[in-house]
Amino acid sequence: KERAWENVYDPVESELIRCALSGRFRINEHELANHYGVSRTVMHDVLMHAQANGLIVKDERSRWYSVPLDESRVNFLYELREHLEPVALSKAAGVIPQRELEQVDSRLIQALRRYPDLPADGLDQLELDLHVRCLSYCPNPELVEALKRTRCILIFGKHLLGREIALPHEEPFFHEHQRIIDAMMRRDGDAVAREARAHLDKARLKVLDRVRHTRSMGVPLDLPYAKEAAFAV
């Protein structure tokens, strides 16, 4: 059964990633709830999930702010991912069911055949397959939890790539994911970590280019619940 906050999470998430790309904004929870016609309780759940995904933070006075997604933060997030994600995926490789890996591999093969004719959420689902679903099998829950705040990188791609940012001429990451999944199916933890590091190294450069491009467009925000805020001194 879908929970109440899930009904409005995606559109709120889309607007919050745009806030993050534009800078630091104060997010008024009451006005946001009114804007979407839901209760404060429902909207608070939405914002708590956005916080877990690294989109917003709450200050000592319980005020919500977007976390700017600029080149510096992209580099910080990828530094964290490059340290932790290869380890987490290599650990997951030892326990994830073979059937799960075969299904992920099958979806990648289908996507390669169809690219660029994919549904709007097609790329996002493939990203989630590896970086969330497969990674969730890591037996170290602290690694999984630490990586949650880096999901704003995936959220950026989810809401902009193939929509406001044109899809690249060549497939964006399918072969890289296939090499990681193949190593996982062989239960070769060292190869999983090696392929994951290579993938993240390439992904960092692509995301940096896309973030620079999006921020350079300077599209003004017109959201009744978001007000540009100065950085704390």
What function would you assign to each model-found segment?
Residues 15, 19, 114, 135-137, ...:
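Hydrophobic side-chain positions on well-ordered alpha-helices
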Residues 1-84, 226-233:
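Short linear motifs at protein or domain termini
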Residues 29, 140-141, 187-188:
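Short loop-to-helix capping motifs
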Residues 160-233:
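C-terminal all-alpha effector/ligand-binding and dimerization domain
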Residues 98-162, 176-177, 194-202:
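Conserved amphipathic alpha-helical segments that form helical-bundle/coiled-coil interaction surfaces
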Residues 3, 121, 125, 168-172:
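Short helix-capping and inter-helix turn/linker motifs at the boundaries of alpha-helical repeat units
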